[in-house]
């Protein structure tokens, strides 16, 4: 699921900051579709929900592709209210795609579900709390027990 397509389809909910679709061609390759969803103007405590359609009740492995840059912050995640396995540090000396980042495996019911990103801080060398979201993938991982 392209994050920028979710924004274009009004499938996001934001509490803190704004989002825009950002072309990434000027930063080299590696972004799916050549764009990302750029989240700016947020601070610690801001939340961005990506609303996704889950086709069937099942366990799903959830993977997200993000961006790193000198002015990006740290994110934590929830999938349908369940905490993700790790936080993501977006700070980097150069703008670059993160590659796949595993949020964990989650039991999800069919229908609209939220993948939530929360700004939780930043490195001392980062100049901001920005975030870039490229895409999200859900892989079936077994029946709900």
Model-inferred region functions:
Residues 1-145:
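Extracytoplasmic
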């Amino acid at each position: 699921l392209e994050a920028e397509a979710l924004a274009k389809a009004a499938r996001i909910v934001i509490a803190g900051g704004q989002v825009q679709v950002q072309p990434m061609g000027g930063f080299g390759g590696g972004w799916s579709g050549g764009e990302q969803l750029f989240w700016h103007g947020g601070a610690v405590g801001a939340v961005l929900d990506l609303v996704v359609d889950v086709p069937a009740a099942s366990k799903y492995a959830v993977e997200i592709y993000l961006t790193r840059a000198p002015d990006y912050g740290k994110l934590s995640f929830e999938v349908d209210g369940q905490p993700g396995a790790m936080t993501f540090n977006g700070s980097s000396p150069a703008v670059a795609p993160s590659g796949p980042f595993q949020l964990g495996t989650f039991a999800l019911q069919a229908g609209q579900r939220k993948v939530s990103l929360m700004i939780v801080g930043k490195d001392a060398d980062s100049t901001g709390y920005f975030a870039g979201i490229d895409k999200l993938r859900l892989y079936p991982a077994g029946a709900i027990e």
